[in-house]
Curated annotation (Swiss-Prot):
GO BP: methylation; protein modification process; protein repair
Keyword set includes S-adenosyl-L-methionine: yes
Active site: S59
PROSITE patterns: PCMT
Localization annotation: Cytoplasm
EC number per UniProt: 2.1.1.77
Protein name from the UniProt record: Protein-L-isoaspartate O-methyltransferase
Function summary: Catalyzes the methyl esterification of L-isoaspartyl residues in peptides and proteins that result from spontaneous decomposition of normal L-aspartyl and L-asparaginyl residues. It plays a role in the repair and/or degradation of damaged proteins.
Length: 208
């Protein structure tokens, strides 16, 4: 029954324009039900966002797929993720790239995500409790940066941690948010606006 729901979701994603088969395989391989509360387990393979506690959500699979596809990842990419949350997006990335560094401001969520990722034998991930606005400069620069909460503007610290030729994807805005892709060249940042979105805000600081 679960496999049928997975195939239904993958078919929906293809209809929504997600055509990267390596990405679709990763989405099919990562057990989304392991990243949500048991009360919502029956909705695990629906194309919808779900609450994970602490006022945070696990993004809908379409948005996970869309943002990941915009990063243009390769098997050797080094990725910074801001907002580990449940760890679901982290797990998708770990199936696709060489290493993922992920920062989460809420200690309880970071600990739970770390445990889930270890249980799934995903060992190419480093997680850290900290302020996502600051990134993780000690591990940079990065080929790709993905931000899963919306700042009102693009954080300078994250721009500085993007390597030449790198790509950052993030929601930007307060009341009205848009998904943006930033590409770094040798002498400039190129910003593309993709589509309207709705994310929780990227809050400064960290919580115990």
């Amino acid at each position: 029954m679960v496999s049928g729901r997975i195939e239904t979701l993958l078919a929906q994603l293809r209809l929504q324009g997600i055509d990267d088969e390596r990405l679709l395989k990763a989405i099919g391989d990562v057990p989304r039900e392991r990243f949500i509360d048991e009360a919502f387990e029956h909705k695990a393979w629906e194309n919808t966002a779900l609450p994970i506690g602490c006022g945070q959500t696990i993004s809908q699979p379409y948005m996970v797929a869309k943002m990941t596809s915009l990063l243009a990842l390769t098997p050797t990419s080094r990725v910074l993720e801001i907002g580990t949350g449940s760890g679901y997006q982290t797990a998708i990335l770990a199936h696709l790239v060489g290493h993922v560094c992920s920062v989460e401001r809420i200690k309880g969520l970071q600990w739970q995500a770390k445990r889930r990722l270890k249980q799934l034998d995903l060992h190419n991930v480093s997680t850290r409790h900290g302020d996502g606005w600051l990134g993780w400069p000690a591990r940079g620069p990065y080929d790709a940066i993905i931000v899963t909460a919306a700042p009102p503007n693009i954080p300078d610290a994250l721009m500085s941690q993007l390597d030449d030729g790198g790509v950052m994807v993030l929601p930007v805005g307060e009341d009205q948010q848009v998904l943006q892709r930033i590409r770094r060249t040798a002498d400039e940042f190129i910003v593309d606006t993709i589509e309207p979105v709705r994310f929780v805000p990227l809050v400064k600081g960290d919580l115990a």
